[in-house]
Structures are given as structure tokens and as C-alpha cells.
């Protein structure tokens, strides 16, 4: 019996030894992005799946672009969810048959109320935005800079430190909004509202 216990302890110790070695290797290869924007306390640079373990800057920039875009969309989604939960709706009808915006329920239930053609229009519009509008056509100042020499809102009047601070704030708020909209959707499916009545 003692042999079985000893053998199981030895096997479990051997099982975890390579994982520690792998973690050291992963940290060493990710040092290239340790000082990038978004590598902030308490986590620092966080890449648990090793997506940029090879140190590829182009791949990192693409993932950062996607993170910023999804963060911006999630911020709009959280704001839209809160607006709808407070009973604020667009005036008029969503289709020619007289279905008013007021009659459409919030959240996932809206998908069963809107016609297939309406959902197809929404998907087509999002596809149009993705392929034609939401593009960085000028090679902006940073990844995710969609000003395209058209919209500025005073961005160029800030010093470099303020710009970095504002970009870090946007990145963190986008990350929080992604978790926030996910939490709202999960709680909706669980039948629990996070919004006080």
C-alpha cells in the first residue's frame, strides 16, 4: 500500500514539473510585449493562450486592433442595454406591418420578434461596416485610430503622456465592457436581472 501511495505522489509530481518549465519559457518569449500599452497592474502582460508567444509584432497589432474594436462595440452594447432596460425606445415601427419598437422585448427575446429579413438587414449592415467603413485607411497614429484625417475632437492638442493615458483608459474600459455585456447576457439567460427595478 505504501508503494502505491509513493508511486502516485511521484507520478503527480512528475506531471506538474513540465508545466512549470513551460511557464518559464512562455514568460521569456512574451518579454517583447511586456511594456506595451495595456500591460497594466495587477496582471501585467496577460497571454494565457500564448497567442503572441512567438513575438510577432504584426500579429500582436492585429489582436490589439480586434481588442479595441470589440471593446468599443461592447461599450455601445452595455449603454444600449441600459437604455432599453430603462424603457427608452425609438419612435415608430420597425417594419411595414406595424410592429412598433415599443413592442419588441429586450435582449435575446428580440431575436424571436424581429423577422428574418430584418435580422438579415442587420447582419448585412454590420458586414458593410466591417468591410467598408471601420478601416484604418491612413495608417493612423496607433492601432485602432480611425480618425483618418477627418475627425479629431482635439486629439492632436494632447501631449504624448496624456494620449497614452487616454488610450489605456479606453482599453481598460473596453475590457470591462466586454465582461459587462457578457454578464448581462448570461444573467438574462439565467432569468436574473442585474438592473435594479
UniProtKB/Swiss-Prot annotation:
Transmembrane segment boundaries: 73-94, 114-134, 174-196
Membrane-topology annotation of the record: Multi-pass membrane protein
InterPro entries: Chloro_AB-bd_pln, Chloroa_b-bind
Annotated localization: Plastid, Chloroplast thylakoid membrane
Pfam families: Chloroa_b-bind (PF00504)
Example GO molecular function: chlorophyll binding
Entries under SUPFAM superfamilies matching the protein: Chlorophyll a-b binding protein (SSF103511)
Transit peptide location: 1-31
Function statement: The light-harvesting complex (LHC) functions as a light receptor, it captures and delivers excitation energy to photosystems with which it is closely associated. Energy is transferred from the carotenoid and chlorophyll C (or B) to chlorophyll A and the photosynthetic reaction centers where it is used to synthesize ATP and reducing power.
Protein name as catalogued: Fucoxanthin-chlorophyll a-c binding protein E, chloroplastic
Protein species of origin: Phaeodactylum tricornutum
Lineage: Eukaryota, Sar, Stramenopiles, Ochrophyta, Bacillariophyta
Amino acid at each position: 500500500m505504501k508503494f502505491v501511495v509513493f508511486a502516485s505522489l511521484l507520478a503527480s509530481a512528475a506531471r506538474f514539473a513540465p508545466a512549470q518549465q513551460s511557464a518559464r519559457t512562455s514568460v521569456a518569449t512574451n518579454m517583447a510585449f511586456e511594456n506595451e500599452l495595456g500591460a497594466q497592474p495587477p496582471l501585467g502582460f496577460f497571454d494565457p493562450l500564448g497567442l503572441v508567444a512567438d513575438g510577432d509584432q504584426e500579429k500582436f497589432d492585429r489582436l490589439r486592433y480586434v481588442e479595441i474594436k470589440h471593446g468599443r462595440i461592447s461599450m455601445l452594447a452595455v449603454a444600449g442595454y441600459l437604455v432599453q432596460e430603462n424603457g427608452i425606445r425609438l419612435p415608430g415601427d420597425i417594419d411595414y406591418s406595424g410592429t412598433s419598437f415599443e413592442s419588441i422585448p429586450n435582449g435575446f427575446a428580440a431575436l424571436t420578434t424581429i423577422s428574418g429579413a430584418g435580422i438579415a438587414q442587420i447582419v448585412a449592415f454590420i458586414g458593410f461596416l466591417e468591410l467598408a467603413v471601420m478601416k484604418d485607411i491612413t495608417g493612423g497614429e496607433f492601432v485602432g485610430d480611425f480618425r483618418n484625417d477627418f475627425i479629431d475632437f482635439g486629439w492632436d492638442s494632447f501631449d504624448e503622456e496624456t494620449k497614452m493615458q487616454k488610450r489605456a483608459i479606453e482599453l481598460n474600459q473596453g475590457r470591462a465592457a466586454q465582461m459587462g455585456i457578457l454578464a448581462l447576457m448570461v444573467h438574462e439567460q439565467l432569468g436574473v436581472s442585474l438592473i435594479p427595478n
